[in-house]
Amino acid sequence: MATECIATVPQIFSENKTKEDSSIFDAKLLNQHSHHIPQQFVWPDHEKPSTDVQPLQVPLIDLAGFLSGDSCLASEATRLVSKAATKHGFFLITNHGVDESLLSRAYLHMDSFFKAPACEKQKAQRKWGESSGYASSFVGRFSSKLPWKETLSFKFSPEEKIHSQTVKDFVSKKMGDGYEDFGKVYQEYAEAMNTLSLKIMELLGMSLGVERRYFKEFFEDSDSIFRLNYYPQCKQPELALGTGPHCDPTSLTILHQDQVGGLQVFVDNKWQSIPPNPHAFVVNIGDTFMALTNGRYKSCLHRAVVNSERERKTFAFFLCPKGEKVVKPPEELVNGVKSGERKYPDFTWSMFLEFTQKHYRADMNTLDEFSIWLKNRRSF
């Protein structure tokens, strides 16, 4: 069966027709059949990756120290977070409490999905306008500047855990027998990330001078997204990008990288890298949390590069508010601004998600463009 699936895939893209999508990105076949990547994956010269990229200085935050009750450790953690989040929104979390064996199992299980035949992965195909499922380079959604990657995304709502296991159930429904352990591992991982995200929200609340539990309570009921990112080897990495320049529209991203590296952040008018640290999670502020802070904390432009030697794997947990919860900053973060101005209108996450899924390709202007779109929509 696997041989038959592969045999039906043309040299550039497979044309496996479905109701939702008409094509699939298959890097293995592209590398086998051509010395050049298709034009759809070639980025403009001004966006092509640079070979001269220096590491970004990002603080290491001792989360266990912050939570220990030691006022000195808590003060240092909030100071470091505030400085980083005000400038570029990126920091590293160490002593995070996530079991290293869970991380090992999570990486181990990625190959069972992403190295399966294209027709097998298609069982979990992501539908247009939805955030769950398999996506191959956004082929079908976009026709140029395609990212050299595959993803598998899951919705995660912690309050549903009592009634169902959202990640595990999605895998079971879409992939069927043979993926039980796969579903269990990523269900456990998503739950661990949700727990970690709420601890980080306590830290962010204190660093902003609001009540410590304010943001934690805001996100206790949430509609988050958990994503597996797989970046295959690329014969011409100097022409392509694994993920194009963008700011995350979500509230908070918790990323774990394998040892390969590829994350770059645009700070001080230049691209800088964040090298892998197996014992730390990379955390960055997203557009929605920037709005919650009235622009005080920054959502920064970043991208992922690829290479010709090794595949790259990452896990990203995107913390998002409950869909219909109104996103607006606490009064302390409005009154502290000159003339008490609001930088962004009230909105809900479901509105913002719809905008990024159906109307706008995320970049550095997503939140501003959404604000304009929202005002125009409300004027009718």
Curated annotation (Swiss-Prot):
Induction: Negatively controlled by the level of physiologically active gibberellin. Not regulated by auxin. Up-regulated by paclobutrazol. Pfam families: 2OG-FeII_Oxy, DIOX_N. Pathway: Plant hormone biosynthesis; gibberellin biosynthesis. One of its GO terms (biological process) is gibberellin biosynthetic process. Its cofactor is Fe(2+); L-ascorbate. It catalyses: gibberellin A12 + 2 2-oxoglutarate + 3 O2 + H(+) = gibberellin A9 + 2 succinate + 3 CO2 + 2 H2O; gibberellin A12 + 3 2-oxoglutarate + 3 O2 = gibberellin A25 + 3 succinate + 3 CO2 + H2O + H(+); gibberellin A53 + 2 2-oxoglutarate + 3 O2 + H(+) = gibberellin A20 + 2 succinate + 3 CO2 + 2 H2O. The keyword NADP does not apply. The active site is at R312. GO terms for molecular function: gibberellin 20-oxidase activity; metal ion binding. Transmembrane segments: none annotated. Fe cation binds at H246, D248, H302. Its EC number is 1.14.11.-. Gene3D superfamilies: B-lactam Antibiotic, Isopenicillin N Synthase, Chain (2.60.120.330). InterPro entries: DIOX_N, IPNS-like_FE2OG_OXY, IPNS-like_sf, Iron_ascorbate_oxido_reductase, Oxoglu/Fe-dep_dioxygenase_dom. Keywords: Iron, Metal-binding, Oxidoreductase. Belongs to the iron/ascorbate-dependent oxidoreductase family. GA20OX subfamily. GA53 is less effectively oxidized than GA12. PANTHER family: 2-OXOGLUTARATE (2OG) AND FE(II)-DEPENDENT OXYGENASE SUPERFAMILY PROTEIN-RELATED (PTHR47990). This is Gibberellin 20 oxidase 3.
